[in-house]
Amino acid sequence: MNVDAASGRLDAARQVPSPNWDARPGDVPIDLIIVHGISLPPGVFGGPWIDAFFTNALDAGAHPYFREIKGLRVSAHLLVRRDGELVQYVPFHGRAWHAGESRYEGRSRCNDFSIGVELEGVDDVAYEEAQYRVLAEVIHALAAAYPAIAPDRVVGHCDVAPGRKSDPGPAFDWARLRRLLGPPLAT
């Protein structure tokens, strides 16, 4: 799994371009990965709804919840589905609209310096082994492409928007992810 520096694309991901992104500030290095959880409708896995949501094509009449989120313009760089399928919506050099109002280590506007990775899931249902495996591979590929991303620079949405967001939730096993990532590389 590799990141193409010119395109900002991950070679292992299915590409579904989202219009919901803009340019990052030019002088800000990418040094953080934010892990999210998403399911549409809430608690339902599979189907076309996440792709449709991130591409502004969600049919508000398909489910009552979709009327509540109609008009939201959000995205993430990547989605890891329950079966491990990897989808990319925004090139990494672009600023995806995933973290919203956020702050980490005294810096606000986390979208400026982070990569957003959505996991298909909810806060209180265990994530799948395939998702942990693919997420670890993604983190290694991103760290190789963006050296400022260190092992301790992978956090949850809950860490950058406490009180506002809870994902990826208590069902996400951070220790399991750390084991898959292995020891930090010597620099």
Cite the ranges covered by each PLM segment:
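Basic/polar, cationic surfaces and motifs that engage anionic cell-wall
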Residues: 2-11, 108, 113, 122-187
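Generic alpha-helix detector with strongest preference for long hydrophobic helices that associate
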Residues: 59, 67, 98, 116, ...
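N-terminal catalytic cores of peptidoglycan-degrading enzymes
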Residues: 1-108
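Metal-dependent polysaccharide deacetylase catalytic core of the NodB/CE4 family, i.e.
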Residues: 103, 119-123
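Conserved, mostly hydrophobic/aromatic
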Residues: 35, 117, 135
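Conserved beta-strand segments that form the floor/walls of ligand-binding pockets within enzyme
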Residues: 79, 116-118
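Residues immediately flanking
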Residues: 37-38, 119, 158
